[in-house]
Amino acid sequence: MDADGVTIKLIGTDEVEAFRHIRLEALRAEPSSFASRYEDWEILSLQEWRDRLNEPVFIAFQKGEPVGIMGLFRQRSSKMAHRATVVMVYIRAKLRGTGLAVKLLEAISDHARDIGIRQLELFVSAENSVAIRFYQRQGFAEIGRIPGGVLEDGREIDDVMMARRLVG
């Protein structure tokens, strides 16, 4: 399948069910790709889900169904508010390799520029070479590692930090 017929939009609290659906799908389908666990999110109240939409969340919809997600978490400190972290990155398996991830990242980047973000950052598992290569193709560079940054099933996995300048 290609990414044609997919609509990407910044969602609001009125679309909390779509957010919940795609986020839980992501955590269930790709548990090693996220620092969070399915069980941590499954128990959230509806209000907690709504509260998480205080930060920008973009969802890709195909025929009204959520098929991808990316979020943006802006730094709070006034001296760091020009930076934001890309979070919750997930594309349904059948749509990977179609350009949908690029389109979601473009939507996030455009929104970030519009709200004064100058640098995007993200963390990715050192074991996820496919994601690392994708981010490199999109202009991200590794800027550091946290040895054993993620503990999964008793195993310590390095967390790779990457960044991309949006301006300057």
Name what the model sees in each region.
Residues 1-3, 50-51:
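Short, conserved catalytic or adaptor-binding loops enriched in Gly and charged residues
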Residues 98:
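Flexible nucleotide-binding loop
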Residues 10-21, 25-94, 105-107, 111, ...:
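Acetyl-CoA-dependent GNAT
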Residues 49, 101, 123, 129:
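Contiguous, function-dense segments enriched for cysteine-driven chemistry
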Residues 5-7:
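Extreme N-terminal starter segment of soluble prokaryotic enzymes
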Residues 118, 125-132, 137-144, 148-168:
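C-terminal "cap" of GNAT-fold acetyltransferases
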